[in-house]
């Protein structure tokens, strides 16, 4: 008797934004106290961002991940003890180690000895984590996975650099995946090119208990934009090819919410109408690895994304990394 094909299927989604919502004008007023000039008009025109959320000083990445995870688990209607794989995509972990995933496993009270680890691919992190969990489930090594993107990027922002500090925010998004004979994730593609590591990075490193060099995010905006618009269309087409789908069969595009100009450019290159693109960058800013699952949860909960529809996600981030997945919700 032939063995049936296993897929990983999205059972539920969840997200969380810290309550401190900071508008462009509020941020501009804060920066003005240090002699840094910016404005709502300047930020909106270049990025599409109108507001972002910042975590309180005593709130960690795992705290944000916990709420998003609880909401995803509730939506999926699964027993937390059945979750035998936890993957957290983050570039702002609570500690160098242990992993944020292990901390989250403990906070959720999961005691089954399942695997838990972090994935670090910056803004591509959720695409990397989702594809990794899908592979584990397809091979039968795990049956139920919790995949999270969570960030406290406000901790690594230089608020004297107006070209970067206005872009990013904090938040978390989560999905629960489960083994299924019904198709869920249909195709994924992941790539990296380390020769571009210097265009988006934190130059400092930990050396004998202190940070050697700058601990703040550095970005060559023009180089990132040029590379992003070049690779995002290609990786999306690659994932669609693996899924044996044409772009016109995509119901919803969820790009990494970095910059509205990059997002609309990719949508246009794929031949998709703009109304099929989920946009949250205006209210969330760039939440790095959290941006895709945050946008996914928003669109699921407001009723736009419905069961049976095809969803294409894609991300690009430091490393340089990029990736995409397409799934039937």
UniProtKB/Swiss-Prot annotation:
Main location: cytoplasm
Domain notes: The last Arg residue of the ACP-binding site is essential for the weak association between ACP/AcpP and FabH.
Record-level GO BP terms: fatty acid biosynthetic process
Pfam families the record matches: ACP_syn_III (PF08545), ACP_syn_III_C (PF08541)
Region (ACP-binding), start-end ranges: 257-261
CDD domains: KAS_III
UniProt pathway annotation: Lipid metabolism; fatty acid biosynthesis
Subunit structure: Homodimer.
Functional summary from the UniProt entry: Catalyzes the condensation reaction of fatty acid synthesis by the addition to an acyl acceptor of two carbons from malonyl-ACP. Catalyzes the first condensation reaction which initiates fatty acid synthesis and may therefore play a role in governing the total rate of fatty acid production. Possesses both acetoacetyl-ACP synthase and acetyl transacylase activities. Its substrate specificity determines the biosynthesis of branched-chain and/or straight-chain of fatty acids.
Name listed for the protein in its UniProt record: Beta-ketoacyl-[acyl-carrier-protein] synthase III
Protein's UniProt keywords contain Cytoplasm: yes
Family from the record: Belongs to the thiolase-like superfamily. FabH family.
Cell compartments where the protein resides: Cytoplasm
EC numbers, comma separated: 2.3.1.180
HAMAP family: FabH
InterPro entries documented for this protein: ACP_syn_III_C, ACP_syn_III_N, FabH, Thiolase-like
Active site per the UniProt annotation: 123, 256, 286
Enzyme class: transferase
């Amino acid at each position: 008797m032939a063995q049936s094909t296993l897929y990983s299927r999205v059972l539920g989604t969840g997200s969380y934004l810290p309550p401190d919502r900071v508008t462009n004008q509020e941020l501009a007023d804060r920066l003005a106290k240090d002699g840094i000039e910016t404005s709502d008009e300047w930020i909106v025109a270049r990025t599409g961002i109108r507001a972002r959320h910042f975590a309180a000083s005593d709130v960690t990445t795992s705290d944000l991940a916990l709420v998003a995870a609880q909401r995803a688990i509730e939506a999926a209607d699964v027993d937390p003890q059945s979750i035998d794989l936890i993957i957290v995509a983050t570039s702002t972990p609570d500690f160098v180690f242990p992993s944020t995933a292990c901390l989250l496993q403990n906070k959720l009270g999961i005691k089954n000895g399942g695997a838990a680890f972090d994935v670090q691919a910056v803004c591509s992190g959720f695409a990397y984590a989702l594809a990794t969990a899908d592979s584990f489930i397809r091979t039968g090594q795990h049956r139920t996975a919790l995949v999270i993107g969570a960030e406290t990027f406000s901790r690594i922002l230089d608020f004297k650099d107006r070209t970067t500090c206005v872009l990013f925010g904090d938040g978390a998004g989560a999905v629960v995946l489960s083994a299924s004979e019904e198709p869920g994730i249909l195709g994924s593609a992941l790539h990296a090119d380390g020769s571009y590591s210097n265009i988006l990075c934190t130059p400092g490193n930990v050396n004998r208990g202190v940070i050697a060099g700058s601990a703040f995010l550095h970005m060559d905006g023009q180089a990132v934009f040029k590379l992003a618009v070049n690779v995002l269309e290609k990786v999306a087409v690659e994932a669609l090819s693996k899924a044996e789908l044409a772009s016109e069969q995509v119901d919803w595009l969820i790009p990494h919410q970095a910059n509205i100009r990059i997002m609309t450019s990719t949508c246009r290159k794929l031949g998709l109408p703009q109304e099929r693109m989920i946009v949250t960058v205006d209210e969330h800013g760039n939440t790095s690895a959290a941006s895709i699952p945050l946008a996914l949860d928003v669109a699921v909960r407001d009723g736009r994304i419905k069961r049976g529809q095809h969803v294409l996600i894609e991300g690009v981030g430091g490393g340089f990394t990029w990736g995409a997945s397409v799934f039937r919700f």
